[in-house]
């Protein structure tokens, strides 16, 4: 009321913004022009202008996403150690693989399932590993984690 012409912007960058690789969800009230605010956040990564409802959804996916990725990275590194690799090499290999796969998905525009199919051979090693991960519930655990994050965000927002 004190500032009737003021526009409220809400932004949710994630922690990779600190190295210029962030993902920021941005919303503004009253369909305001977001050009200037988008430019600010583009300096630290990518920006998605979304509705208020989608801001919380994107927060559950990409705002909290680095935490999920670090758990996956740590698990992959532990797997590398389990099969005999030195820890630092396992961490580097897992991190570079995650980085490369993410970059490949972004730059190619190809659906992740197709990219996955391109690296799996019938009866091969990759599909054996994916099968074991699927049997262990990896896919549903990741989905359930994002849903739980959104539910908690909604609770905190009340």
Residue ranges and their predicted role:
Residues 4-7, 23-58, 69-107, 150-152:
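Internal alpha-helical scaffold of NAD(P)-dependent oxidoreductase catalytic cores
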Residues 10-12, 27, 120:
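Short beta-strand segments
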Residues 95-158:
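NAD(P)-dependent Rossmann-like dehydrogenase/reductase catalytic/cofactor-binding core
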Residues 8-9, 55-60, 112-117:
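Short pre-catalytic strand/loop immediately N-terminal to key active-site residues, enriched for Gly-Thr
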Residues 12-21, 59-69:
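Glycine/serine-rich anion-binding loops at beta->alpha junctions
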